[in-house]
From Swiss-Prot:
Its EC number is 3.11.1.1. Keywords: Hydrolase, Magnesium, Metal-binding, Schiff base. Mg(2+) binds at D9, A11, D183. The gene is phnX. Involved in phosphonate degradation. This is Phosphonoacetaldehyde hydrolase.
Amino acid sequence: MKIEAVIFDWAGTTVDYGCFAPLEVFMEIFHKRGVGITAEEARKPMGLLKIDHVRALTEMPRIANEWNRIFGQLPTETDIQEMYEEFEEILFAILPRYASPIHGVKEVIASLRERGIKIGSTTGYTREMMDIVAKEAALQGYKPDFLVTPDDVPAGRPYPWMCYKNAMELGVYPMNHMIKIGDTVSDMKEGRNAGMWTVGVILGSSELGLSEEEVENMDPAELREKIEVVRNRFVENGAHFTIETMQELESVMERIEKQELIIS
């Protein structure tokens, strides 16, 4: 079996180490309403279409109960829409600062292209958001062959439609000749639902939630423990393989191709 295409996520996988761009904004829009949410809570739905992310936060029992205590009712669709509009406004202003390719990504992409492998991408960002991120990333040397946003398909993750559209545009079939790689639980579900080899990348991921500086300065034993927690989370949610850095991706591809593995 030959791998013909790799479909990458964006924030936390190929750009924005640690996926920090949306994190503070999610926390801020709730804080402004007197409802404090933690970074861990804010990260949990990461990878979803952003309005679905806001909705998922309002459905978390602790957050819903706190909202009900303050406002005397649960969050409404109007509340969700208002928060999402605020989220967009703030995020658009900061996105250009969070579009730098993660270390090693450009080199891996170049190596894949030398092997004739096509490069696709999916995201939880809207097309308007990605117009900003993709433009800035391209200026810094990262540009996949194709990009699909949730706006382009009936629904975003965990549905497989963005992966299917990549497959059609890249001209690759069957789906088990493709790899989906990402940094969130929703990425793992998206890849699995699409019938693709699914890989979770740990360092730089939203699931790990650490900056490069934090990774560098953390006690090695503590860091190893956190890495293993994320690894297990990926596997529990469908990952066929996990890698700590993007540089390990090609060895995963070789395992698939040489051992003639079958997706289960």
